[in-house]
Regions:
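Beta/alpha (TIM)-barrel catalytic core signal, keyed to glycine-rich beta->alpha loops juxtaposed to Asp/Glu
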Residues: 3, 130-314
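Acidic (Asp/Glu)-rich catalytic clusters
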Residues: 73-84, 114-118, 168-172
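A short acidic, helix-capping loop that chelates divalent metal ions and anchors anionic groups
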Residues: 25-30, 92-98, 214, 289
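N-terminal binding-site loop/beta-alpha segment at the start of enzyme catalytic domains
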Residues: 1-83
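Acidic-and-aromatic substrate-binding clefts and catalytic sites of carbohydrate-active enzymes
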Residues: 60-69, 92-93, 131-135, 183-187
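Active-site groove signature of glycoside hydrolases
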Residues: 114-132
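A short, structured active-site edge motif that brings together acidic residues
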Residues: 82-94
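Short, acidic/polar
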Residues: 35-49, 100-117, 161-167
Length: 314
């Protein structure tokens, strides 16, 4: 699989990145720690991803309250291979525990992440959220210090809006921004993508299927499937439950059928066609869910085709 460099660094990531946020939990939500994929299921997914040429894995200290990093570390040790590793910090690892991007906390959290992963350094370390209590000078200084002592190779930010990213850029330039972006979530088109282009920052979106909405999983006047994002964490997607969205999704499914691909493949193809997208983070719940992402690498869209799909969703 093709790899691409991040920002101005020598770190490369595969065009499809394996998101490990469902290993041992559902993202960073404490109420779901211990749920999500079991270790056995996570191993199946990582085996499948590695076998398909996905060589970059994305996790975070708070995913599953540390369980995700632990599973990734055990898989690395058992398989004798080392994928490119991205991890993050900000969120608490227990209910009511500390959080944030203070220098001492980041150093402590990185040390524990390295221990769980069983490695001496990670390729990319991300601020998982913006911390209003930490100055840009402190944050950039912390990251640069970790690079200097070879605990990380590059750094970046996640879930930063345009204003937050702009304030950071007055002090330092991250190698990568990792935000939610899809045909149904285009907020980053209002500033973030422009800043990334202007400063040579790579962009690796997560949530390419908008919690399953772009796969056709959710139907009008029908209960949401058990175990789906809308069943477990509906908040980020509740605004999509309207007739306008369903009508656009109907047309999107028709276009996918005409092209002979799964809607998930078309959704990821659209992202890969965007000139500002370096790689796409996908978080499968089962190994077979990797197949639409791999198919998207071969299903290339022209600029006009990508623009037509974007117009479907405003």
């Amino acid at each position: 699989m093709e790899s691409r460099p991040l920002g101005g660094t020598d770190v490369e990531v595969s065009r499809i990145i394996l998101g490990c946020g469902n290993f041992g939990g559902i993202g960073s939500a404490p109420e779901f720690f211990g749920q999500g994929e079991s270790e056995e299921e996570a191993f199946w997914i990582m085996d499948a991803a590695w076998g398909l040429g996905i060589t970059t894995f994305d996790t975070a200290d708070a995913y599953g309250g540390g369980r995700s990093e632990t599973m990734v570390g055990k898989w690395i040790a058992s398989r004798g291979v080392t994928p490119g590793l991205i991890t993050k910090t900000f969120n608490p690892m227990e209910t009511g525990a500390d959080h944030g991007l203070a220098r001492t906390r980041m150093a402590r959290q990185l040390e524990s992440s390295l221990e769980r992963l069983g490695v001496d350094r990670v390729d990319v370390y991300l601020a998982h959220e913006f911390d209003p209590d930490v100055s840009a000078n402190e944050l950039v200084g912390t990251f640069e210090g970790l690079v200097a002592i070879s605990l990380i190779r590059a750094w970046g930010v996640s879930n930063f809006d345009a204003e937050q990213l702009r304030s950071l850029l007055e002090t330092g330039t991250p190698a990568v921004v990792q935000n939610s972006y899809s045909l149904l979530d285009r907020a980053d088109e209002r500033g973030v993508l422009e800043l990334c282009a202007a400063f040579g920052i790579s962009y690796t979106p997560f949530g390419p299927l908008a919690g399953g909405w772009l796969t056709g999983k959710y139907k009008r006047d029908a209960p949401v499937p058990e175990g789906s994002r809308m069943a477990m964490r509906p908040g980020p997607y509740e605004h999509l439950r309207n007739e306008e969205t369903f009508a656009s999704l109907d047309r999107f499914a028709e276009i996918a059928a005409q092209r002979g691909v799964h809607p998930a493949t078309l959704a990821i193809s659209w992202l890969l066609a965007q000139p500002h997208v370096t790689a796409v983070v996908v978080g499968p719940r089962r190994p077979e869910q990797l197949e639409p992402a791999l198919a998207a690498l071969e299903h290339q869209l022209s600029q006009s085709e990508a623009e037509e799909l974007a117009a479907l969703f405003g």
